[in-house]
A protein has these predicted regions:
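Protein kinase-like catalytic core scaffold
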Residues: 155, 214-215, 262, 275-278
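Glycine-rich phosphate/pyrophosphate-binding beta-alpha loops
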Residues: 165, 280-290
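Rossmann-like NAD(P)H-binding beta-loop-alpha module
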Residues: 127-153
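Conserved N-proximal alpha/beta basic substrate-recognition cap immediately N-terminal to
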Residues: 20-133
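Phosphate-binding site of ATP-dependent enzymes
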Residues: 166-257
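ATP-grasp fold ATP-binding core
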Residues: 124-125, 149-166, 188-199
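Extreme N-terminal starter segment of soluble prokaryotic enzymes
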Residues: 8-14
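A long amphipathic alpha-helix within ATP-dependent nucleotide-binding catalytic cores
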Residues: 225-276, 287, 296-313
Length: 315
Protein backbone atom coordinates (compact mmCIF):
# COMPACT_ATOMS: atom_id res chain seq x y z
CA UNK A 1 0.00 0.00 0.00
CA UNK A 2 1.46 3.38 -0.97
CA UNK A 3 1.50 6.55 1.08
CA UNK A 4 -1.34 8.76 -0.18
CA UNK A 5 0.16 11.87 1.48
CA UNK A 6 3.86 11.78 0.43
CA UNK A 7 4.64 15.32 1.65
CA UNK A 8 1.83 16.24 4.06
CA UNK A 9 1.68 19.79 5.36
CA UNK A 10 0.62 20.47 8.95
CA UNK A 11 -3.17 20.69 9.14
CA UNK A 12 -5.37 22.26 11.80
CA UNK A 13 -8.47 20.24 10.88
CA UNK A 14 -8.58 16.57 9.95
CA UNK A 15 -11.41 14.41 8.77
CA UNK A 16 -10.82 10.81 9.82
CA UNK A 17 -12.67 8.21 7.76
CA UNK A 18 -12.77 4.42 7.68
CA UNK A 19 -10.07 2.30 6.09
CA UNK A 20 -9.85 1.78 2.36
CA UNK A 21 -11.25 0.49 0.04
CA UNK A 22 -14.52 1.54 1.71
CA UNK A 23 -16.33 4.16 -0.36
CA UNK A 24 -17.06 7.44 1.40
CA UNK A 25 -20.71 8.29 1.90
CA UNK A 26 -22.08 11.13 -0.19
CA UNK A 27 -22.63 13.27 2.93
CA UNK A 28 -19.04 12.68 4.06
CA UNK A 29 -17.74 13.75 0.65
CA UNK A 30 -19.94 16.85 0.78
CA UNK A 31 -18.61 17.76 4.22
CA UNK A 32 -14.99 17.15 3.17
CA UNK A 33 -15.44 19.52 0.22
CA UNK A 34 -16.87 22.20 2.51
CA UNK A 35 -14.04 21.81 5.03
CA UNK A 36 -11.43 22.01 2.27
CA UNK A 37 -13.05 25.23 1.05
CA UNK A 38 -13.13 26.66 4.58
CA UNK A 39 -9.60 25.70 5.67
CA UNK A 40 -7.63 25.23 2.47
CA UNK A 41 -4.25 23.56 2.96
CA UNK A 42 -4.89 23.47 6.72
CA UNK A 43 -7.43 20.68 6.14
CA UNK A 44 -6.56 17.03 5.52
CA UNK A 45 -8.58 13.85 5.05
CA UNK A 46 -7.05 10.66 6.40
CA UNK A 47 -8.16 7.04 6.25
CA UNK A 48 -7.55 5.05 9.42
CA UNK A 49 -5.28 2.63 7.54
CA UNK A 50 -2.88 5.41 6.50
CA UNK A 51 -1.61 6.20 10.00
CA UNK A 52 0.90 4.71 12.41
CA UNK A 53 0.84 5.51 16.12
CA UNK A 54 3.62 4.94 18.61
CA UNK A 55 5.76 6.01 21.55
CA UNK A 56 9.40 7.06 21.13
CA UNK A 57 11.68 8.43 23.83
CA UNK A 58 8.70 8.77 26.13
CA UNK A 59 6.63 10.84 23.66
CA UNK A 60 3.56 9.91 21.64
CA UNK A 61 4.24 9.82 17.91
CA UNK A 62 2.22 9.87 14.72
CA UNK A 63 3.49 8.87 11.26
CA UNK A 64 2.24 8.06 7.80
CA UNK A 65 2.70 4.54 6.47
CA UNK A 66 5.59 5.94 4.44
CA UNK A 67 7.35 7.09 7.61
CA UNK A 68 6.65 10.82 7.45
CA UNK A 69 6.16 12.27 10.95
CA UNK A 70 2.89 14.13 11.49
CA UNK A 71 1.89 16.85 13.89
CA UNK A 72 -1.52 16.14 15.42
CA UNK A 73 -4.27 18.46 14.25
CA UNK A 74 -6.12 20.78 16.57
CA UNK A 75 -9.51 19.32 15.60
CA UNK A 76 -10.50 15.91 14.21
CA UNK A 77 -13.90 15.46 12.56
CA UNK A 78 -14.60 11.76 13.13
CA UNK A 79 -16.49 10.21 10.21
CA UNK A 80 -15.70 6.60 11.05
CA UNK A 81 -19.05 4.95 11.82
CA UNK A 82 -19.09 4.34 15.57
CA UNK A 83 -20.83 0.95 15.70
CA UNK A 84 -18.25 -1.16 13.81
CA UNK A 85 -15.25 0.50 15.51
CA UNK A 86 -12.86 -1.96 17.12
CA UNK A 87 -11.58 -1.17 20.61
CA UNK A 88 -8.05 -2.28 19.72
CA UNK A 89 -7.96 -0.53 16.34
CA UNK A 90 -10.00 2.60 15.50
CA UNK A 91 -10.75 3.50 19.11
CA UNK A 92 -7.08 3.16 20.04
CA UNK A 93 -6.21 5.56 17.19
CA UNK A 94 -8.82 8.05 18.39
CA UNK A 95 -7.50 7.80 21.93
CA UNK A 96 -3.95 8.40 20.69
CA UNK A 97 -5.01 11.56 18.85
CA UNK A 98 -6.95 12.73 21.90
CA UNK A 99 -3.96 12.16 24.19
CA UNK A 100 -1.74 14.06 21.75
CA UNK A 101 -3.97 17.10 22.29
CA UNK A 102 -6.39 16.95 19.37
CA UNK A 103 -10.04 17.83 19.96
CA UNK A 104 -12.25 15.03 18.64
CA UNK A 105 -15.68 15.90 17.31
CA UNK A 106 -17.48 13.97 18.55
CA UNK A 107 -15.45 13.32 21.69
CA UNK A 108 -14.09 9.85 22.40
CA UNK A 109 -16.40 9.45 25.40
CA UNK A 110 -19.43 10.37 23.29
CA UNK A 111 -18.31 8.03 20.50
CA UNK A 112 -18.06 5.16 22.99
CA UNK A 113 -21.54 5.82 24.35
CA UNK A 114 -22.99 6.00 20.85
CA UNK A 115 -21.35 2.86 19.46
CA UNK A 116 -23.28 0.51 21.77
CA UNK A 117 -27.07 0.68 21.74
CA UNK A 118 -27.33 -0.43 25.38
CA UNK A 119 -24.86 2.25 26.49
CA UNK A 120 -27.03 4.78 24.66
CA UNK A 121 -30.19 3.59 26.36
CA UNK A 122 -28.52 3.67 29.77
CA UNK A 123 -27.63 7.34 29.35
CA UNK A 124 -30.96 8.31 27.80
CA UNK A 125 -32.99 6.59 30.52
CA UNK A 126 -30.91 8.17 33.28
CA UNK A 127 -31.52 11.56 31.65
CA UNK A 128 -35.26 10.95 31.93
CA UNK A 129 -35.88 10.63 28.19
CA UNK A 130 -38.45 8.19 26.77
CA UNK A 131 -36.97 4.96 25.38
CA UNK A 132 -38.56 1.59 24.54
CA UNK A 133 -38.43 -1.19 27.15
CA UNK A 134 -35.33 -3.25 26.35
CA UNK A 135 -33.66 -6.46 27.53
CA UNK A 136 -30.07 -7.52 26.83
CA UNK A 137 -27.30 -9.57 28.42
CA UNK A 138 -23.53 -9.85 28.94
CA UNK A 139 -22.41 -13.49 28.85
CA UNK A 140 -25.68 -15.35 29.39
CA UNK A 141 -26.33 -18.04 26.76
CA UNK A 142 -28.62 -16.74 24.04
CA UNK A 143 -30.75 -19.90 24.19
CA UNK A 144 -31.45 -19.08 27.83
CA UNK A 145 -32.06 -15.38 27.20
CA UNK A 146 -34.85 -16.04 24.69
CA UNK A 147 -36.62 -18.24 27.25
CA UNK A 148 -36.43 -15.65 30.03
CA UNK A 149 -39.84 -14.71 31.52
CA UNK A 150 -38.66 -11.07 31.33
CA UNK A 151 -38.56 -11.19 27.53
CA UNK A 152 -41.92 -10.25 26.06
CA UNK A 153 -43.03 -10.42 22.45
CA UNK A 154 -43.56 -9.04 19.91
CA UNK A 155 -40.11 -7.50 20.13
CA UNK A 156 -37.50 -6.00 17.86
CA UNK A 157 -34.19 -7.88 17.85
CA UNK A 158 -30.98 -5.93 17.15
CA UNK A 159 -27.25 -6.35 17.46
CA UNK A 160 -25.98 -3.94 20.12
CA UNK A 161 -23.56 -2.39 17.62
CA UNK A 162 -25.35 -2.88 14.30
CA UNK A 163 -25.65 -0.10 11.71
CA UNK A 164 -27.80 0.78 8.68
CA UNK A 165 -30.60 -1.53 9.77
CA UNK A 166 -28.44 -4.65 9.57
CA UNK A 167 -29.19 -7.54 11.95
CA UNK A 168 -32.62 -6.13 12.85
CA UNK A 169 -35.83 -8.15 12.72
CA UNK A 170 -39.24 -8.36 14.36
CA UNK A 171 -39.99 -11.44 16.45
CA UNK A 172 -43.80 -11.69 16.64
CA UNK A 173 -43.72 -14.47 19.22
CA UNK A 174 -41.40 -16.57 21.39
CA UNK A 175 -41.31 -19.55 19.03
CA UNK A 176 -39.38 -17.64 16.37
CA UNK A 177 -36.79 -16.60 18.97
CA UNK A 178 -36.42 -20.21 20.11
CA UNK A 179 -36.01 -21.34 16.50
CA UNK A 180 -33.34 -18.80 15.48
CA UNK A 181 -31.35 -18.50 18.72
CA UNK A 182 -28.91 -21.18 17.65
CA UNK A 183 -28.16 -19.52 14.31
CA UNK A 184 -27.66 -15.90 15.41
CA UNK A 185 -24.12 -14.52 15.37
CA UNK A 186 -22.40 -14.61 18.76
CA UNK A 187 -19.65 -12.00 18.29
CA UNK A 188 -21.71 -9.30 20.01
CA UNK A 189 -24.85 -9.46 22.17
CA UNK A 190 -28.33 -8.72 20.91
CA UNK A 191 -31.00 -6.58 22.50
CA UNK A 192 -34.71 -7.32 22.57
CA UNK A 193 -36.76 -4.15 22.39
CA UNK A 194 -40.42 -3.29 22.76
CA UNK A 195 -42.12 -3.13 19.36
CA UNK A 196 -43.68 0.31 18.92
CA UNK A 197 -46.57 -0.74 16.68
CA UNK A 198 -47.68 2.82 15.89
CA UNK A 199 -44.28 3.47 14.29
CA UNK A 200 -43.88 0.16 12.42
CA UNK A 201 -41.88 0.91 9.26
CA UNK A 202 -41.55 4.63 10.12
CA UNK A 203 -38.64 6.45 11.74
CA UNK A 204 -38.09 10.18 12.16
CA UNK A 205 -34.40 11.13 11.86
CA UNK A 206 -33.35 14.52 13.27
CA UNK A 207 -29.85 15.90 12.69
CA UNK A 208 -28.61 17.90 15.68
CA UNK A 209 -25.51 20.12 15.57
CA UNK A 210 -24.30 22.11 18.57
CA UNK A 211 -27.62 21.74 20.35
CA UNK A 212 -29.85 22.81 17.45
CA UNK A 213 -31.96 20.75 15.02
CA UNK A 214 -30.69 21.48 11.50
CA UNK A 215 -32.58 18.89 9.48
CA UNK A 216 -35.26 16.22 9.77
CA UNK A 217 -36.39 13.43 7.49
CA UNK A 218 -39.09 10.76 7.65
CA UNK A 219 -37.88 7.28 6.70
CA UNK A 220 -40.55 4.84 5.54
CA UNK A 221 -39.94 1.17 4.80
CA UNK A 222 -40.93 -0.72 1.68
CA UNK A 223 -44.21 -2.62 1.89
CA UNK A 224 -44.63 -3.86 5.49
CA UNK A 225 -40.96 -4.19 6.44
CA UNK A 226 -39.89 -3.13 9.93
CA UNK A 227 -36.63 -1.28 9.19
CA UNK A 228 -37.06 2.02 7.37
CA UNK A 229 -33.38 2.59 6.55
CA UNK A 230 -32.51 3.84 3.07
CA UNK A 231 -29.88 1.08 2.93
CA UNK A 232 -32.75 -1.42 3.13
CA UNK A 233 -34.75 0.17 0.33
CA UNK A 234 -36.78 2.64 2.38
CA UNK A 235 -37.86 6.09 1.21
CA UNK A 236 -37.10 9.46 2.77
CA UNK A 237 -39.15 12.66 2.93
CA UNK A 238 -37.72 15.91 4.29
CA UNK A 239 -39.80 17.28 7.18
CA UNK A 240 -37.63 19.86 8.96
CA UNK A 241 -39.72 21.96 11.33
CA UNK A 242 -42.89 19.86 11.04
CA UNK A 243 -42.39 17.96 14.30
CA UNK A 244 -41.06 20.52 16.81
CA UNK A 245 -41.62 18.29 19.86
CA UNK A 246 -39.60 15.54 18.19
CA UNK A 247 -36.82 17.96 17.33
CA UNK A 248 -36.69 19.13 20.95
CA UNK A 249 -36.46 15.53 22.14
CA UNK A 250 -33.64 14.90 19.65
CA UNK A 251 -31.69 17.86 21.03
CA UNK A 252 -32.05 16.51 24.56
CA UNK A 253 -30.95 13.04 23.43
CA UNK A 254 -27.80 14.40 21.77
CA UNK A 255 -27.04 16.42 24.91
CA UNK A 256 -27.48 13.37 27.15
CA UNK A 257 -24.80 11.52 25.15
CA UNK A 258 -22.46 14.51 24.90
CA UNK A 259 -22.71 14.65 21.10
CA UNK A 260 -22.04 17.90 19.22
CA UNK A 261 -23.10 16.18 15.98
CA UNK A 262 -25.83 13.54 16.06
CA UNK A 263 -28.49 11.81 14.05
CA UNK A 264 -31.34 10.93 16.41
CA UNK A 265 -33.86 8.30 15.31
CA UNK A 266 -37.28 8.69 16.91
CA UNK A 267 -40.32 6.40 16.86
CA UNK A 268 -43.94 7.53 16.97
CA UNK A 269 -45.79 6.34 20.06
CA UNK A 270 -48.85 8.31 18.86
CA UNK A 271 -49.38 10.88 16.09
CA UNK A 272 -47.66 13.55 18.21
CA UNK A 273 -45.60 11.74 20.88
CA UNK A 274 -42.23 10.07 20.46
CA UNK A 275 -39.64 7.76 21.96
CA UNK A 276 -35.91 7.62 21.19
CA UNK A 277 -35.00 4.59 19.09
CA UNK A 278 -31.25 5.19 18.82
CA UNK A 279 -28.63 7.88 18.31
CA UNK A 280 -25.92 7.95 15.63
CA UNK A 281 -22.65 9.80 16.27
CA UNK A 282 -21.72 9.86 12.56
CA UNK A 283 -24.98 10.59 10.76
CA UNK A 284 -25.55 10.84 7.05
CA UNK A 285 -28.00 13.27 5.48
CA UNK A 286 -29.81 13.86 2.21
CA UNK A 287 -28.69 16.43 -0.41
CA UNK A 288 -31.81 18.51 0.21
CA UNK A 289 -30.91 18.93 3.90
CA UNK A 290 -28.88 21.99 3.02
CA UNK A 291 -28.40 23.36 6.54
CA UNK A 292 -26.43 20.37 7.83
CA UNK A 293 -23.03 20.83 6.16
CA UNK A 294 -22.77 24.57 6.96
CA UNK A 295 -23.76 23.84 10.57
CA UNK A 296 -21.11 21.14 10.99
CA UNK A 297 -18.50 23.35 9.31
CA UNK A 298 -19.32 26.15 11.75
CA UNK A 299 -19.23 23.69 14.66
CA UNK A 300 -15.73 22.54 13.74
CA UNK A 301 -14.55 26.12 13.19
CA UNK A 302 -15.75 26.96 16.69
CA UNK A 303 -13.85 24.02 18.16
CA UNK A 304 -10.76 25.11 16.23
CA UNK A 305 -10.96 28.64 17.65
CA UNK A 306 -11.31 27.31 21.20
CA UNK A 307 -8.46 24.85 20.74
CA UNK A 308 -6.18 27.56 19.36
CA UNK A 309 -6.95 29.77 22.36
CA UNK A 310 -6.31 27.00 24.92
CA UNK A 311 -2.70 27.16 26.18
CA UNK A 312 -2.97 23.61 27.54
CA UNK A 313 -3.54 22.24 24.03
CA UNK A 314 0.04 21.85 22.82
CA UNK A 315 1.35 20.04 19.75
Amino acid sequence: MTDQHPTPTPADVWMLVRHRPAVLRRSTQELATALAAAHGSRFALWHTDELLIGIRDGRLTLHTLGGTPLEPPRVVCVRQVAGPMDNDREITLLRHLDRMGATLVNSLDAQLKARNKIWQLQELALAGLPVPDTLSYATAPLEGVVRSPDLTTPCVVKSVNGAKGAQVFLAPGPQLLHDVAGSLARETPFLFQQHIAHSHGRTLRVIVVDGAPVGAVMHTSRHTALAANIANGGTATACTGRHPEAEDLAVRAARALGLHIAGVDLLFTSPDTYTVCEVNAVPGWRPDMTQVTPAITACLTGHLARAAADPQRTH
